[in-house]
Amino acid sequence: ADIGAGSGYFTFRLAHFVGAKGKVYAVDVSPDMIRHVNRRIRETKASNVVSILADADDPLLPDQSVNRFFICDVWHHVENQTKYLSLMKKMLKPGGEIVMIDFHKKELPFGPPMQMKIAREDMIKQMAANGFGLSKEHTFLPHQYFLVFAPK
């Protein structure tokens, strides 16, 4: 599930990766973005992409329906992060994961304002406080951290 899918930049790449037997949920709170994703679904005949117009505090996905949540540069927009994590935990299938990619908390000429950035260490602490442990970390991105969490 691509949380904060926007225009579907990652959604359609993930859909290609999971193939015809997989499914990618494009989750966004913006009706305009969902319309854009729906248009791309039709244009590309992406039968494995399902768009979801979500609530700000609920991705509106069925329990145990998601293998992996993909959250790139949008976590700071989620107002009630504790509630959101609780819901995602229920929505994960056994063995599921949450991928968090976000900007390092330092001054950059792009990305969200400094006060909205979440430090890597704070993200790990927040996830641990909500029942998720760090299972993998990738360091190939120069300006962002790439963390993978699994329920404890």
Language model: regions and residue ranges:
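Short strand-turn motif at the edge of the Rossmann-like AdoMet-binding core
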Residues: 29, 74, 101-104
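Class I SAM-dependent methyltransferase SAM/SAH-binding core
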Residues: 1-59
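Core SAM-dependent methyltransferase catalytic element
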Residues: 130, 135-152
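Glycine-rich phosphate-binding loops of nucleotide-dependent enzymes
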Residues: 4, 66, 77, 95, ...
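A short acidic, Gly/Pro-enriched loop at the edge of an enzyme's catalytic core
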Residues: 57-69
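A short glycine-rich, Lys/Arg-flanked "PGG" loop and its adjoining helix->strand segment in the class I
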Residues: 15-19, 82-97
